[in-house]
Amino acid sequence: DIGNNEFVAIIGGSGAGKTTVMNAMSGFDYDISGKVYCNGIDLRKNFQSLKNIIGFVPQQDIIYENLKLRRMLEYTAQLKMPPDTTKGERDERIQKVLQMVGLEERANEYIRKLSGGQKKRASIAVELLADPGLFFLDEPTSGLDPDTEKSLMNTLAKLSKTENKTIIMVTHTVQNINLCDKVIFMGPGGKICYCGKPDKMYEYFGKDSLVDVYSELASNVDMWNMKYLMLYKEQHLDKNTEIPEVNENEKISDMIKDSGKKTSPLKQLGVLTKRYFELVFNDRQRLLLLLLQPFIIALLLKVVAKKDVFKIYDSTQSIMFALACSGIWIGLFNTIQEVCKERPILKREYMGNLRLWTYILSKYIVQAVVCFMQTTILTGLFLVLMKHAPKKEQVLPTPQLEIWLTIFLTIYASAALGLIVSSCVRNSDRAMALAPFVLIIQLLFSGVLFELKGAADKISYITVSRWSMECLGNITNLNKLNMKVTGMPHEHNDLYNRGASHLTNTWLILFLMMAVCGVISVIVLRNLK
């Protein structure tokens, strides 16, 4: 049993199940037996109603390093606090939270410039915005030096008493465990061996040091687990202690007040989009790289392009294929790490009131701007450098604009594909490891290197490269161009049939692919755990 405003530490060796127990207690892990009660309310049964009064800080930081601390808290406050909260009230809450964690003087610094301990305090500040009564922290002192660890422990102990928070944390370090009100010691196999005051722990085990306690539990965990269960039975079960019956609906209503109200979808989308814009444009080095890529690629395409591009079949098909592949790589590189690198933050916000479709749509909106700039640089410079140009437009005022739109849709659809990959994996390394595989599929089923027949033709329907090349072949009228060797005919390719309706329909297919990729990304992310 954990009382109100208690500061509790769950300790034990690696693999003892500390985090598993905390996840079960917090209600974030449904795959458990038994029940957890919060003020007499079944937490698992009423988790959707109670989750807004629960703060949870995972081991990874849940903050964006490319935002200033105050800006990070402002965005989070707009997402977490009741929708009718005024800006003045949000600012007041942010200032109070900064004071709670001792970061007032760091409020206007970029989070990436904060120390490890300060970043952990910033993560705690993010959760404090919603004023939760129950707080869970997973390894908050991991990787901190002794002085920083002591400072953080003092902050947590102060929060539990002065701010009326019940704080439960998992930790390996015990130098300042005396600041806790209660310690839960877990032995191998997830067996609880002690639950009580920290100053009584060594006396309970009959040992003088933590190392001796670990050694004792490694060899006699069942005995100590049995002792704990017997004591628990004597203190609680033999006294017929029961969970008091409460009117859950009334109790929940009293506990959550206005915290359960959700921000409107449009407002949430606006906040997420504005935040993502700021993140992208604050990362100047990466943004420069994203815009430098199409510039360099356009120059390289000019270097390898022959003078008879748009005049001769071989040269035109090759350079259009290179242009399409360049667009695919640029789009994929834009987003393949965008979701997985934010996974801890996304998971925590989704446990709150974040709508996944607004999250993905905010990515689409910002990426549309980035893709627009990249397309303009790539196609604009490439077409200016070319000696010749396609001769006749079909849908737009000029064939150059038709090529621009095709490459824009190619880059954008590839960025949407990158979001799927990023949604499926847990870290950036795995995402980048999958990038070559995705690109190889685009190369094989583009219809340029190999003839598409049977299964290959069907697979090509889900590739960006096939539809991109179909558009470019249509615009440049490949079927009507001559081979380099005079008099040598080339086989007519139905993919490159010229026609305004054919071109428009192919553009629509690329647009539809973007929409489908967005839906798939949302579905994949619904399995966040």
What do the predicted segments below correspond to?
Residues 26:
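Helix-to-loop junction immediately C-terminal to a conserved catalytic motif
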Residues 203-210, 218-219, 278-529:
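Membrane-spanning alpha-helical segments of multipass transporters and channels
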Residues 60, 65-82, 93:
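Q-loop/switch helix immediately C-terminal to the Walker
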Residues 129-133:
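A short, proline-enriched helix->beta-strand linker immediately N-terminal to the Walker B motif
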Residues 135-138:
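Catalytic Walker B motif of ABC-type/P-loop ATPase nucleotide-binding domains
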Residues 110-114:
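Conserved ABC ATPase signature
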Residues 124-125, 152:
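Hydrophobic anchor residue at the start of the ABC signature
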Residues 1-6, 13-14, 33-38, 80, ...:
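Topological signature of polytopic alpha-helical transporters
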